[in-house]
Amino acid sequence: MITIDGKYTEARVFTDELEDLARTQIRDVCNHPAFEASRVRIMPDVHAGAGCVIGFTAELKTDKVIPNLIGVDIGCGVLTARLSGLPDFSSFDARLRERVPSGMHARPSVHQALLDDPELDEEISRICMDVLRTDKDRHRRSVGSLGGGNHFIEIAQGKEHAFLCIHSGSRNFGLKIAERYQKIAVDTCPDAYLKERKKGLCYLQGENTLNYMRDMKVAQRFAALNRRVILHELLDDAADLESFDTVHNYIAEDQIIRKGAVRAGRGEKLIVPLNMRDGSVICIGKGNEEFNSSSPHGAGRSMSRKKAKANLSLEEFEASMQGIFSTCVSRATLDEAPMAYKDGESVLDNIHETAEIVERIRPVYNFKAPE
């Protein structure tokens, strides 16, 4: 474990390896008034992110909120459903491509599931018109779409059952909310040093915080519905399947900020994906307050996307995916190759105090779209 001290608090990092930029980003948080006396805990999958490290958790103890810390994919997570059996992968892949838009694409029309939730639909429309001042139609049509980058749809085999894992978030809707409120933070932040030198750490206060928290929760609901719609588009028996949702990039009811980290409350089921080749672990949380009742959300990147595309070869990517059905192994997704991520075992070695690993599931089918 590494301890990093700052003006307002200290951070504990649950790994012995930390890159310099990540260390700097953590120290910036510890020197930030928003985290005075806050318990800051960094998960073992930590790596530098846009303005803040991935794997960040902290108590929310003031009304000073930094939208950039929650990030742009608000409410992103993995919906995991236990399957009644394995589908034919070719047919499944064709159905996915027909029914679930990916990458930058949205649906041709608003999905019925959103129309069946008029309160959420109204809130999305309100945010688009009053906060984002943008066309609501595109965002509404994004419910039921996957996205690109590290988002995926995967079928994995466990000891007795197979599982469908759907990793997606709030799409461009969450991005626009994050960008809008971070701009408000920059415009209204009273800290001249932050405004001049570290705009990504400018914070909201008062009514602006309340407005952000309200709209962030709408984005979380958007993301949860998005994953659920994808599940129902892919499986005819979706309503009958046992499932659980594991969310990162949000502030939950326990008032813990989690960016690239998931809640691991006592008895709570969660999943930690590692990479396209090695699959995931299903865990039960221990509710360990020393970890802010949190767990890593994945293995964490060892290479930036740019570095991965420059240094990895398609041939080694293809070799690493032998035995896994995928029509997505290409130069366009090379930045998601297993070798671009940290060794999953090193991350799993550091989570036993916060979560019990109950099952390892291995991928037999994987779908990803380019960034």
Model-found features: residue ranges?
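Active-site acidic/histidine clusters and adjacent loop/turn architecture
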Residues: L114-D117
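Domain-length cofactor-binding catalytic modules of enzymes
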Residues: I2-D28, F35-I42, A48-F56, T62-P67, ...
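Loop-rich catalytic cores of soluble enzymes, especially ATP-dependent carboxylate-amine ligases
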Residues: H111
